[in-house]
Structures are given as C-alpha cells and as structure tokens.
Design a protein with these regions (language model features):
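Metabolite-binding pocket within alpha/beta catalytic cores that recognizes anionic/polar moieties
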Residues: 1-131, 287-290
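Non-catalytic positions within long, well-ordered alpha-helices that form the structural scaffold/packing
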Residues: 76-79, 176, 195
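Short acidic/polar active-site loop segments enriched in Thr and Asp
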Residues: 81-82, 181, 200
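Generic non-transmembrane alpha-helical segments
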Residues: 136, 140-151, 238-246
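Active-site/ligand-binding-proximal alpha/beta "capping" segment
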Residues: 147-181
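Zn-dependent metallopeptidase/amidohydrolase metal-coordination segment
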Residues: 185-223
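His/Asp/Glu-rich mid-to-C-terminal helical/loop segments that flank catalytic regions of hydrolases
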Residues: 212-259
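Acidic, Ser/Thr-rich low-complexity intrinsically disordered segments
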Residues: 261-290
C-alpha cells in the first residue's frame, strides 16, 4: 500500500501543526488553470501527506469561484489517491449542535454556477454517484475522531448551496423537510470531480451554527462560524494526525472508485481526439490510453 497518498482539503489553519517540520510548497499547473493555492507537501511519522486550502491562504476565493477541476487535477498529479475534506457547515437538526462533527455519506447538490465535470468536450462519461464517499475512508475518519473523544455522527446528508450568501428561512426549512443534516457551500462539485478522477473521497463536516431555522439561536454570521472553528482547531488538527497514521489500513482494494471509469466513458474510441485525451491525461489517462 506504499503508493497510497492522502490529501486534506480545508482551511489553511489545518496544516499549522508543530510536527509538520519538513514542508515543500508545490506550484502545479493544470489544463484547467491553477489550483486555489500552492499545495503543501509534508511528512508526518514518515508518511507523505498533502494539504490544499480550497479558498486559498487568507480565504480570498468565494465558493463559486473555486477552481475545483484544477484542485483535483493538481492533487492527482501529485500522486494523491485519497482525499478527506474538512469544512464548516450549518446544522439542519436540533441534535447536531455547534461543535459536533459529521462524517458525511450523502450530498444534495444545489449549486448552479459551477463547472461540474472533466468530461464536457468530445469525451463523455457518466460516473456513479450513488455512494459519493468511500467506506474505508469513512472508517478511518471515524477511528480518528473517536481517538480524540470528539462528539460526532457517522452518516449524514450535506446540502451544498451556491452561496456566498447564507440561506433564507424558507430555504432552510425546505432543506429540513428533506431530512438533510447539514448545509454548506464547498463539497460540490469537489466530490463529483474526485470520483471522475478515481480518487477516493470522504468528508468531515464541523458544525458551526444552526443556519437560520432555529428559533432559540441567532441566525448564522461569519463571526459565529469563526469562533466555533477556532474552538475546534486543536481537535481537528489531532484528527488529521490520526488520519495520516491510520488511513491506509482502512483502504478497500475493491472500492468502486478505484476503477469507476471502466464503466463510465460512453464516447466511441474513434471520436476521442488526441487533444482531449491529452487534456484528460491526469484524471483519466488510465482508461484513455488503452
């Protein structure tokens, strides 16, 4: 399993860990443009790990403007096989209070201004998103969270909204009527693109607020989100260190993500131009070179 490499996508503070002493910042170009920022390559307990701040260092990229395709392509170029997303979310349920972690297993994609596929020009593919997260990585996340005695829930549906504005009360109540658990702005199309690139994906969401539906709590604002995130910072960093140590032992060699493109590409071989195959070399080269 020596070829498995973990990347964490999240806030820039997540890699501010004392033990990460050997650091290299990678500038990577992709056919889709530049990723959100330089990718940090570091080592922990002799294991290589990568960190990418999806909003850029200093949080200057709006959710709708994140270059998700470049981020995923750049991580794949770096040899990444597994991605764990760490993000702030609002709670849509009373039993998911601020401070609780949720290991996501489903998404409802409500975004509308983002490019959501690598396969949009001459080569068409339809990957399955029935189960958008990888069970093995979820197991690794759960073990890492338990070790820190963090209050958490395994399994939950994440509504991904376009943003950058927060929800209206009507929207928040609509999502609650769908029995969704949390709401945020960042995990789509990230999870879809990771699947298209055959990278295993898991999502750990940190609840920071009750959105705007709860009659006994203030409506969400940025200062409230930051306050809870800072309170969770030490726990999140320790969780990540645990993940680096344990994720490989949970990898499922039969994970459907590993070879999902084998049954996804529908375009006839004679219609696949070399120009497009070259563009997709990183994310789909395994199947397109056959």
């Amino acid at each position: 399993m020596a070829n498995n490499k973990l990347a964490v996508i999240g806030g820039s503070g997540l890699y501010d860990v004392e033990e990460f002493t050997k650091r290299e910042f990678l500038k990577i170009d992709t056919p889709w443009g530049k990723p959100s920022d330089e990718i940090l390559k570091t080592n922990y307990n002799n294991k290589e790990v990568f960190f990418l701040p999806r909003h850029g260092r200093g949080h200057f990229i709006s959710p709708s403007k994140i270059n998700f395709k470049a981020n995923i392509d750049a991580l794949k170029q770096s040899g990444v096989t597994d991605i764990v997303s760490v993000s702030a979310v609002g709670s849509l349920k009373a039993d998911l209070p601020p401070g609780k972690f949720v290991i996501i297993d489903q998404f409802i994609d409500r975004t509308f201004a983002r490019n959501k596929t690598f396969f949009e020009d001459e080569i068409v593919a339809h990957v399955s998103m029935a189960h958008p997260t990888s069970n093995g990585l979820m197991d690794a996340c759960e073990e890492s969270i338990k070790k820190e005695k963090i209050d958490y829930q395994r399994g939950g549906t994440y509504v991904v909204m376009e943003g950058p504005q927060f929800s209206t009360l009507a929207e928040s109540n609509l999502y609650r009527s769908w029995n969704a658990d949390v709401i945020g702005m960042t995990n789509m199309p990230e999870a879809k693109l990771a699947r298209e690139a055959e990278i295993r994906y898991a999502s750990v969401s940190m609840v920071t607020d009750y959105d705007c539906w709860h009659p006994e709590h203030e409506n969400v604002d940025v200062q409230q989100v930051i306050k809870v995130l800072l309170g969770n910072a030490a726990k999140a960093k320790n969780m990540i260190k645990n993940l680096i140590d344990n994720f490989e032992k949970h990898i499922d060699p039969k994970d459907p993500t590993n070879n999902c493109l084998d049954v996804a590409i529908i375009t006839a071989p004679e219609k696949r131009t070399q120009k497009t195959k070259d563009k997709l070399k990183t994310v789909a080269g395994r199947v397109l070179k056959k």
